[in-house]
Amino acid sequence: TYIDGNKGILLYRGYPIDQLAERGDFLESCYLLLYGELPTKQEKHDFDRCIMQHTMVHEQFARFFHGFRRDSHPMAVMVACLGAMSAFYHDSIDITDPQQRMIASVRLISKVPTLAAMAYKYSIGQAFVYPRNDLSYAANFLRMCFSVPCEGYNINSVLTRAMDRIFTLHADHEQNASTSTVRLAGSSGANPFACIAAGVACLWGPAHGGANEACLKMLQEIGSVERIPEFIARAKDKNDPFHLMGFGHRVYKNYDPRAKIMQKTCHEVLKELNIQDDPLLDIAMELEKIALNDEYFVEKKLYPNVDFYSGITLKALGFPTE
């Protein structure tokens, strides 16, 4: 992955992120990152089929979940589940074997959404939903999260596309904290599942993967559109420790290229769901307007970043902030 923070460029294996997110899908980006080239039509078909045939997890994982409290943080559950994968799939933990490394990669890509959906279902006391191999990657994940056994679940193409873009935009981001953690763990010869578990533990931090959660909590703290000027003034005050979450980026000194796509996606989702009376989303939209026009934000290039829009989009899709 290549990043030019000054020009606002993000490339996966030489391909601009906007092209991959708009014209392709997440599994196409996975293939690109794994093999270095975009797949042919047949290669894409075979890869998709391979991934979707590995979405089931060992049935004992259901019992594994019952060892957690219902209010456990989902990242704590994911760290444990990913580490446990090495106990369930010990035929793909030899990192010196290229074939085992590839099998581990396929298993991680295919099974992590299933485990994440199980973590969500467990937290709200609902029955686990098994994956369906005839659905797309993103549609499968949304169905596992939000369907219930007592009624049908309709696949919404706009929401599915939004989820797929979120996956694509977060697939890789150069040598960030979680990637560095995975590589450091891997340098000791640890198995792929343990390494990814370490990466997820790093991703848990509020300065990394927790940024969109922190952004939504900030919107909750603001509380109403009328209070926005007060918090804008605090953000401009050097002596006030308050920071506007979801604005600016440590790497991108220009507009975050992922944010442009996520902004469009966010508005597509809000329009599709006809969301007009959510106070948090009202605050977010007003903050967006101010940040794109206020001289202070424009001069300092504090544009809304990918976490700002992805947090709002995920909330609109139905995912709770926590």
Curated annotation (Swiss-Prot):
The active site is at 249, 307. PROSITE patterns: CITRATE_SYNTHASE (PS00480). It catalyses: oxaloacetate + acetyl-CoA + H2O = citrate + CoA + H(+). One of its GO terms (molecular function) is citrate (Si)-synthase activity. Keywords: Transferase, Tricarboxylic acid cycle. It is an enzyme of class 2 (transferase). Its EC number is 2.3.3.16. Belongs to the citrate synthase family. This is Citrate synthase. It comes from Bartonella taylorii. The lineage of its organism: Bacteria, Pseudomonadati, Pseudomonadota, Alphaproteobacteria, Hyphomicrobiales.
